[in-house]
Amino acid sequence: VLFGADQEHGLRPGTENVASIVALGVAAKLAAESLATTASHLLAMRDRLHHGLAASIPDLQLNGHLAQRLPNTLHLSFPGVSGRALLAEAADAVAASVGSACHSENDAVSGVLAAMGIDATRAAGAVRLSVGRMTTFDEVDRAMEALTKAWHARHTSQ
C-alpha cells in the first residue's frame, strides 16, 4: 500500500511531473492542429501502396471495407503464398505482420478474419501493412518492390 505525502493530502504518493504534463498538452495541441494534414498524407501513402501492389499482383485481395477504414492501415491477402513466408522473404525491406503481437507465432485463422467470412486459404496469405506520418513515397515504393519481388519468388516456387 502506498500513502501520499502532505502536499498530496495523503491521497497519492509522489509529486506530479509538471513539465511532462505541460509537454503532453502541447503535443496534443500540435497533433490536433495537424490531424487533417496527417490523415491526408497517411491516406495517400496507404492508397499508393495498395494500388501499386494490386497492379503487380494478380488476385490480391483487400480484407475490409474499401472506404470505411483507417487511413494508415492496409490488410491484404496475397494469393497462393503464406503471409509469414512472404514477410520472411521481404524482411530486409519491409517491417509488417501477419497478426497481432500476442498471436505472432499462431498460424490459425484469426477470429476477426473468420468473422468477416474469409476462408483459411485466403487468410493464410493475409498481411497487415501500416504507414506512418513520416513515411515517404520512396519508402512506399521500396516496400511495393520488395513485396512484389517476394510474392513472385514464393508464388513461383510453390
What are these regions (language model features)?
Residues 74-128:
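Conserved C-terminal alpha-helix-loop-beta "cap" of PLP-dependent enzymes
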Residues 56-59, 72-75:
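Cofactor-pocket helix-loop regions in the catalytic cores of large enzyme subunits
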Residues 53-54, 90:
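Hydrophobic C-terminal alpha-helix "anchor/cap" residues
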Residues 28-51, 60-70:
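Structural signature of PLP-dependent enzymes
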